[in-house]
Amino acid sequence: MTSPAAPAATPVADKLPETLTEPNLPWMCICWDDPVNLMSYVTYVFQTVLGYSRKRATELMMQVHTEGKAVVSSGERDKVEGDVKKLQTAGLWATMQRADG
């Protein structure tokens, strides 16, 4: 009886997966227009949750209202994920996507 064959050696990857080697590109938090929330409430949320001045919060709210969406924050993935969660908790429609550089 012969001994079992040794397992074939698994080749070691020459490079790491792209997710580990890509630079940490900025991410964007996008707030979308919805038929539910009042403009005054959206402005209030931008002020209290994201820390914008009343003027800047109003500008962003008007962009959401007229264009259908606005980038309301950007940065590293963890920060933007937090902003999206906070806006969603406040009842706004928010998503995130990688900023194209």
Curated annotation (Swiss-Prot):
InterPro entries reported for this sequence: ClpS, ClpS_core, Ribosomal_bL12_C/ClpS-like
Domain of life: Bacteria
Chain segments annotated as transmembrane: none
Pfam families in alphabetical order: ClpS
GO biological process: protein catabolic process; proteolysis
Residue pairs linked by disulfide bridges in the UniProt entry: none
Function: Involved in the modulation of the specificity of the ClpAP-mediated ATP-dependent protein degradation.
Family in the record: Belongs to the ClpS family.
Subunit structure: Binds to the N-terminal domain of the chaperone ClpA.
Protein's name in the database: ATP-dependent Clp protease adapter protein ClpS
Gene source species: Corynebacterium jeikeium (strain K411)
